[in-house]
Amino acid sequence: MNRPASASVMPTAIRTVAGGVTTSPAGLLLAAGAGRRMGTPKALVDDWLVRGVDVLAAAGCSPVVVVLGAALQKARALLQGRAVIMAAAADWSDGLSAPLRTGIDALPAGAPAAVVTLVDLPDVGERVVRRVLEYGARPATLTRATYHGRPGHPVVLGRAHWPGIIAAANGDVGARAYLARQVPALVECADLASGRDIDWPEEAISVGVWHA
């Protein structure tokens, strides 16, 4: 049953039990874009890629899947030695939906849910991910962070939603069309972060998240 956007839900534990085995939500970091406005792929900006992986892992996500595309070899090199699953989106230039589909396909079948976030959210930290996960990480979970009421990331996608998201993801809309129909539970996180995606070098430098 869909929840209205204003629904409140009671926190639950991050870990869930499936078939008698304690499992964790997977992390899914989308980092495939060319970053045309930034002038470089965002996966290569400062420590954003490594930080995104570390945030998900520190919040209890395992495994962490990273979807790469532009500057593939350079981005892979930044993650050498880290316990991540790297997935290459061959069609990354088609828009956000292509890396999202690639990432969902790379998720382990036994994961109850995936925590999806973007590489260009450098002030979204571990506490934000943990807060959103407090509201569940089960196969039916559909939860999204908001910032002063504005929907953002991370988004917790329960496994039951993955086929529908893949089917609905086209162009640059990602999971937007699916989330508009299903209406996730919303978790306010503006006291922890801005949730602002950084698109321009001047923005990154002005807020201290790129040391050019």
Spans of features found by a protein language model:
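Nucleotide phosphate-binding site architecture
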Residues: 35, 45, 162-163, 205
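Amphipathic alpha-helical interaction/coupling elements
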Residues: 131, 160, 177-178
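A short acidic, helix-capping loop that chelates divalent metal ions and anchors anionic groups
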Residues: 36-40, 164-165, 195
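Short aromatic/basic micro-patch
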Residues: 123, 156, 197
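Conserved alpha/beta core of the MobA/IspD/sugar-nucleotide pyrophosphorylase nucleotidyltransferase superfamily
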Residues: 3-4, 9-23, 167-212
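Short beta-strand and adjoining strand-loop segment in the mid-core
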Residues: 101-103, 162-165
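Nucleotide and nucleotide-moiety/phosphate-recognizing core
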Residues: 20-151, 181-189
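Conserved nucleotide-sugar donor-binding
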Residues: 150-164, 201
